[in-house]
């Protein structure tokens, strides 16, 4: 019941913040140059066809009821799609509504995000502390693109509360171009800290839970997005010969959300290095993934076994924030067979 209360509180608040953040991000001028993609509905007749679309294109939405994926498609591939037998419907109005490049000024960059985190630590030293849990790829391999960043988290809670409290772990921005998610993570942390002692829900959460917030799990990628590119992945450019500057269809890096050790290389990931869903050369090949897995493992004792439901009293909750699809997803992503907990 406690977990359900936490989830309900969070989802309602999150929905409001995502709407506000997305609305703020939408307040940008109509572009003067054509966008680098065409928005189109790509229709599919099977799960295999959908997977091929996901692997080869930047899918923004999947409408299972009508059997299409809304995708950003490179203009020079539209004819080849149609020749291959794919039903394609181009949406010119929506295509022209998106900018060819640029970074919305309403979103903070990595430097701003780090400064806001530091401000919270300074303002509420009894309730929040920073934790360094690793390094970004560029931090270990600096080059002309930059020197990289330390990976940081905020740990929130009443220091006087008993040890062994359940964990609420919130992670944002593993996909760099999903710019609303770090803003939402910061807003969530700020609301808990500002509300402690006056707001019943915020006080209850910080008194009874450990709350860990990662504002950006992919700072290198975020910095690329700040330059106006549709970067999704991290900054590892050692595999493949990819487009530079990056495009939404062709970019260097590894999709950190496809690089985790568990069930690596299965449904929903790509083996092509320049694909936006490239999974990396091996499970947890990326330093960001390794750091995150070690950090989480140090906070949560795994009680999971394949094919066996989680114990009913499992208290911890991990949420990964994304600004794509308007979905609430739960494990597993590598199979269509429901989890034993469903």
Where are these regions (language model features)?
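Bacterial N-terminal signal peptides that target proteins for export
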Residues: 1-11
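Bacterial N-terminal signal peptides
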Residues: 9-20
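M14 metallocarboxypeptidase catalytic domain recognition
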Residues: 23-342
């Amino acid at each position: 019941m406690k977990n359900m209360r936490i989830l309900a509180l969070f989802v309602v608040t999150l929905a409001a913040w995502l709407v506000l953040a997305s609305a703020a991000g939408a307040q940008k001028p109509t572009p003067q140059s054509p966008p680098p993609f065409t928005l189109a509905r790509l229709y599919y007749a099977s799960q295999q066809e959908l997977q091929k679309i996901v692997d080869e294109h930047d899918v923004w939405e999947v409408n299972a009821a009508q059997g299409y994926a809304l995708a950003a498609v490179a203009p020079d591939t539209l004819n080849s799609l149609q020749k291959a037998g794919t039903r394609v419907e181009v949406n010119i109005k929506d295509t022209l509504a998106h900018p060819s490049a640029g970074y919305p000024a309403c979103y903070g960059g990595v430097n701003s995000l780090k400064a806001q985190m530091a401000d919270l630590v300074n303002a509420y030293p009894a309730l929040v502390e920073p934790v360094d849990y690793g390094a970004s790829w560029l931090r270990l391999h600096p080059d002309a693109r930059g020197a990289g960043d330390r990976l940081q988290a905020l740990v929130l809670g009443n220091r006087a509360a008993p040890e062994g409290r359940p964990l609420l772990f919130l992670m944002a921005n593993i996909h760099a171009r999903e710019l609303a998610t770090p803003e939402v993570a910061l807003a969530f942390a700020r609301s808990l800290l500002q509300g402690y002692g006056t707001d019943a829900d915020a006080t209850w959460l910080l008194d009874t839970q450990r709350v860990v917030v990662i504002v950006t799990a992919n700072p290198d990628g975020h910095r690329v997005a700040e330059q106006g590119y549709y970067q999704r992945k991290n900054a590892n450019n050692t595999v493949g010969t990819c487009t530079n500057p990056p495009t939404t269809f062709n970019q260097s890096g590894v999709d950190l959300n496809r690089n985790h050790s568990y069930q690596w290389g299965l449904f929903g990931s790509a083996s092509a290095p320049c694909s936006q869903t490239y999974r990396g050369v091996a499970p947890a090949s990326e330093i960001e993934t390794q750091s995150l897995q070690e950090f989480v493992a140090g906070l949560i004792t795994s009680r999971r076994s394949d094919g066996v439901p989680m114990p009913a009293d499992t208290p911890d909750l991990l949420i990964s924030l994304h600004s794509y699809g308007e979905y609430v997803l739960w494990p597993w992503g590598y199979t269509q067979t429901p989890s034993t907990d469903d």
